[in-house]
Amino acid sequence: MARNVLESSLLGAGFSIIFQILCRILTFGINAYIVRHVGREVLGIMNVRLLLLESTLLFLSREAINRAALSANAQQGDRCSWAQLINQMWLTVPICAVLCAPCLYIWLNWLSAVDAIYASQYEFACYAVAFSCVLELMAESAVFVAQVFCFVKLKILLNTLHILVRSAIFLWIVTGDRSAAINAFAIAQLSSAVTIVLGQYGFFYFYLKGFKDFVTQQAKKKPVAPKAWQVSLYEHMDDFPFKQLSDFLPGVMFNPNGKHFNRELQTLTLSFVKQGVLKQILTEGEKYVMSVSPVLSFGEQATYDVVNNLGSMAARFIFRPIEDSSYFYFTQTLSRDIKLAKQPQERVRQASSVLNNLLLGVSSIGLIAFTFGQSYSYPVLLLYGGPDFVAGGLPQSLLQWHCLAIYLLAVNGISEGYMFATNTSRDIDKYNYLMAIFSVSFLVLSYILTGIFGPVGFIFANCINMLSRILYSTYYIRHQYRPLSLDPLLGLWPGKLFGCTLFLAGIVCYWYQSSDLATHLGVGVLAGLACLLSWALAHRDLVRLAWRYGRRIKIE
């Protein structure tokens, strides 16, 4: 196998960022339309309650299995066959089906009730979301294969397609009947799930036929020179084990090990299951608190969700794709069960350098967001939701404090992701107990601080929680690299020049807040360019490295 894991990870991160930007622009546009024309309460039901149901089912069903399978494929390829991996991925479907029963009962009977005029639509939407999750997971084996064999463009293409299908169907129904917005959401969810399944299996149906013809042609004594797109798709795929589409189904593929499941893989999966439940609570904790207790009305929940989504743009556009790609890179580069001193030192040094650069990049973005967010929260929210939306000052206060959470979220995503990628099963089990403490503390803090500070209390609780997790993961990284005299955590400090420029930019932008909007925005653009220039001057080597990889990606 000659696939370049680092290059594929960078390519995946780059395409994912572009995809996230395009799709989130579309999503934000739809949300703005709903806020202005349908109502905040409907937006709260869809974006908080129903998407929380989808997030809960999908995360608990596949996160642990997917992470464990990625690690097993990279580090236990001789002990864990592809047939066992495919069987393992198909476990997500019955797991999700089983989870649907208690989740639907809770969502329909235990959580705070919706208004009577939306009750029937809400019930239908809950069942539709649950079924769409089961349907989507039927393509999980194909999604996993595409990830392992670096089909980066396929992932981006299908993700874009399913977002477009979901958005188009939703808007088509809502523009015809605004009162059917929740039903439209449910139908759109089902349609997007069907798109994912058909897209994944449709691609591999044609890919397997083309790959077979390519191999046959190249085996001839005088093979015809392959076309560029054939080389891109089929070259360096000698280890691709699938011969027919039915190999993606459970129990069909030939299994040299004899057993349907791998015991070590199941042990690792169970470790991630415990961790996954806790991580889901930490990720969506504020939504669970809002749903379980009547802290906020659906309208207030929608306000918080809109501001939270705007504040999380950097996380969705940039941090999450980088986190996913870096996790994949570290699992494929470093072994969990062997100390770094006993692993190939070239790989270890490369991993240390990559971790350092990742921390440098995301922490710099987080500091920029925090600096400019203090001065530009109000104009952003005014342009997004209109004067009525920003009235009262709550949305502005939420977004300003959320900018602090962005920095902590950026650092935590990379440091904790690295820790998860290199932990042993025993280390993961130990950390699960700490995650339990974090989870309980976060929920308690959310409830207490919300009672004191209102919705801003959710952000305070989240910041305290992330800071605690950062301290633990950075301690792990420092302890792991100390014997090698390497310190990738140096990337957390972007440098004096950049720091001083940011500080001055923040003061200048804050000073011009009372000016007219055009002047304020113009000052912000100039200050932002100054910050970017100072960062580039302070980190010339990293800029040159990014430029080289960017050119390679463009050429390919």
From Swiss-Prot:
This protein's name: Man(5)GlcNAc(2)-PP-dolichol translocation protein RFT1
Membrane topology summary: Multi-pass membrane protein
A Pfam short name: Rft-1
Annotated TM spans: 10-30, 41-61, 91-111, 129-149, 156-176, 184-204, 353-373, 389-409, 440-460, 461-477, 489-509, 517-537
Family: Belongs to the RFT1 family.
GO biological process: dolichol-linked oligosaccharide biosynthetic process; glycolipid translocation; protein N-linked glycosylation
Main localization of the protein described in the UniProt heading: endoplasmic reticulum
Glycoprotein as UniProt keyword: no
Species for this entry: Drosophila melanogaster (Fruit fly)
UniProt signal peptide: none
Cell compartment(s), UniProt: Endoplasmic reticulum membrane
